[in-house]
Amino acid sequence: MLLTVFCCICGWSINAQETTRTAQGLKNIIQEQGLSQEVIFYSPDIVRVIAYPGQTRPEKKSYPVVLSPEEVKLDYTDNGDILSMKTSCMEVRVNKQTGKIAYYDLNGNLLLQEKEFGINFIPRQDGPNKSYRVSQRFLLDTDEIIYGLGQQQDGRMNQRGQELYLFNENTKVSIPYFTSEKGYGLYWDNPSPTTFSDTPMETSFNSETGLMSDYYFIYRNGTQDGVIGCIRKLTGASPMLPLWTMGFWQCRERYKSSDELCDVLDRYRELGIPLDGIVQDWQYWGCDSNWNAMKFMNPRYINAMGDEKWMRYLPNGEDPNANYPEPRIKSPKEMVDYVHKHNAHLMISIWPSFGPWTDQYKELKEINALLPVITWPRNSGAQPYDPFNPKAREIYWKYLRNLYDMDIDAWWTDATEPDHFDRKDKDFDFMTPDGTFRSVHNAYPLMSNKGIYEQQRALSDSKRLFLMTRSSYFGQQRFASFCWSGDVVSQWHVMRKQIAAGLNYTLCGIPYWNT
């Protein structure tokens, strides 16, 4: 009676166990849970496993994954309750009754197994949509060491024995992926806020919203090089960065005029200290209401001090009556050319949020592509844009062309989590074209960097791209994205923690990182 009631709630009935072989794996009905389960081989070393209530697979977009399933030679062995599928790299055994899956190497050594009946769906409302809280539980060896989960600030290398809330924010990059000393990797493909938990009883991912459980198991020859090679195949290759980006950089918070920036460059050259890159930080656009205008509108940069048309843009806190000397560098383009003439490169700060005076703000508001959240700078009226909206990404690039056309060399994509203060649950009900902000949250930096990379690449392939960003997600390496560890404080114990943070981050398959 209980089973009948549950199946009616799910909208379908189960009369008998059904396991069907497919071209890429199998489809299985788990009677006791009323779930459909699919095992899909993308390659001999990458297998995807999904499960969902009912018989019809929900539509789902994967932001990191770019690989389509390849034709894979599978050797099936049916031993009653257990169906085995073997490739040239691994063996996957499925319990047809319970749906439990176990992964083995070709010598029969157990790599990882799911927990029996370890998939849970709890109905919830996600904004206007019906959805579920989705969790999946696994069993690891007692003393097994795992790495990954992005860039955490706890100083730990081994990620066992803890609970982590995977939610992107300043200094914390959350990637629902771990890799084992046994030579496999596991990516949980859900960009909503997710809790990772590891106890002596189980290891689990529990996501705030989703229509299916969805993960990728990766195993190639038992090495981390093999796993990372598979990640690049699954999510995209990492482009070669410009050689100069591997050199010495100079940055401060912040240069307040073109002269100040160029004077610092001059001093490096006088001292004979090699310098490859120098950074123009925030407020070159002016005051907070004009935040991220992507134009030099600060009167100190455009030789317009005293001009009423431009003085309204003078940054908050700067004295409009101060006796500033006549600038030697009189325009932003002259500054960029000066940097290049002295054999250096210029990176400039750009943000996902826009102040209410900017043209971007007005255009994005017209298409409902501004997130209704409190962001940096506070009390300015600035709002982050919606990078899941293709039109919004086009608007973003249209204005970034102002800086691109000046021959600026690299982009500092700051605060790409994005900053979100005084968070309320209703903030996450905002509807993007792909669903609620809650359902896509952690993929925000991936999509924001994607928009810049792809729009610039469509314009020209003559110059290597370089994007330094404050946040990241699985697969972001394909957008020439270089993450740094955010606004950490300058203390020795904090610096020590960055070593583990960077190593765990790069073990997620993203090679470039700094602090």
Question: Where would I find each of the regions flagged by the language model?
Answer:
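A low-complexity, Ser/Thr/Gly/Pro-enriched, surface-exposed linker/loop concept
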Residues: 17-25, 40-84, 122-124
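Glycine-centered tight beta-turn/hairpin loop motif at sheet-sheet or coil-to-beta transitions
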Residues: 30-34, 87-89
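Catalytic domains of carbohydrate-active enzymes, especially glycoside hydrolases
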Residues: 263-283
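Catalytic and substrate-binding clefts that recognize carbohydrates or anionic sugar/phosphate headgroups
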Residues: 78-245, 251-254, 258-270, 471
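Bacterial Sec-dependent N-terminal signal peptides
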Residues: 1-19
